[in-house]
Amino acid sequence: CGVLWGKKQAERLMSRQVCGLIDAVVIDLDNNRDKVRAIMDVTKQVKSGRNFLIFPEGGYTDNKNELQEFQAGCFSCSLQSKTPIVPVALFDSYKSMNSNTFERVDTQVHFLKPILYSEYGELKKKEVAEFVKSRIAERMAQIKAGEINESYEMIG
């Protein structure tokens, strides 16, 4: 599985090593040409059968489990490759990314029901972004309300 990784994050010591190991595609979010290059590269790899992890918020922030604005451009990969989108809800991941300690952090990872091309193929990029975000937001609300037991993984 590949990762579309922001240049600023990728330049950090540990991240740089991980990027090399997983053959990540690095994207400079401040450079429009590089954004296009990276999205085209990811699209090509997805069409050839490789899976990619993309953070549509454009990076990690101290978000306190609140979704940030999704960057619609990253959904070009899915629209052009006509592949399913698997939304992933990450709960408490911000705690590990914005800390200067090596303390243990429990992060919940919820893989949601895949969204097939037949469900989003007629939508524009911005609409796909909102559709995916709404699915993740629904799961985040369930987690916050205690409706999802963190000790097991539930798909759907």
What are the roles of these predicted feature ranges?
Residues 1-32:
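Catalytic core of membrane glycerolipid acyltransferases/transacylases, capturing the structured
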Residues 36-156:
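Non-catalytic C-terminal accessory region of glycerolipid acyltransferases
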